[in-house]
A protein has these predicted regions:
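Oxyanion-binding "anion nests"
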Residues: 31-71
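Tandem CBS (Bateman) regulatory domains
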Residues: 13-37, 72-123, 130-149
Length: 149
């Protein structure tokens, strides 16, 4: 009742108590995603040898293929690399990328993203804006380390 009188809402609680259990539950994907130069973005026509370098240097175990307009075209994971190992170096990124990857938006609650990662048994996923442009990558380890449950 006092919180309502003072117009103190969940966003205010998160701002003043970000390290607490409730604060972790109120956090958004945008609070944990890696963005900017950290994004593992590759062109669909990129040779897999170059994709491997990008995936290794970025360290997320995932790479996103993008179209010329910058929209997400697909995602390549470590599992995709293992499944295509025999012919990997003769392929291009777009031939391996999953064209229907699991994605989230920056405004999704981090706890919901964690549940999705757990349900799908994946360690990372791409964060896209409302138009489908990659704006971040989210790793399960970052959420667990922060106490999101």
């Amino acid at each position: 009742a006092v919180m309502e009188l003072r117009r103190f809402n969940s966003k205010d609680f998160l701002k003043f108590h970000p390290g607490g259990e409730l604060g972790a539950q109120l956090a958004r994907v945008s609070d944990f995603m890696h963005d900017g130069d950290a994004l593992p973005l590759v062109g669909a026509d990129m040779p897999m040898s170059d994709v491997l370098i990008t995936m290794t240097s970025k360290g997320f175990g995932i790479a996103a293929t993008t179209r010329e307009d910058g929209l997400l075209n697909g995602v390549i994971t470590d599992g995709d690399l293992r499944r295509n190992m025999g012919k990997l170096m003769a392929m291009k990124a777009g031939e391996i990328a999953n064209p229907s990857p699991v994605t989230v938006t920056p405004d999704l609650f981090a706890a919901q993203a964690l549940a999705l990662l757990n349900d799908r048994k994946i360690g990372a996923l791409m964060v896209v804006d409302d138009q489908g442009k990659p704006v971040g990558v989210l790793q399960i380890h970052d959420l667990l380390r922060a106490g999101v449950a």
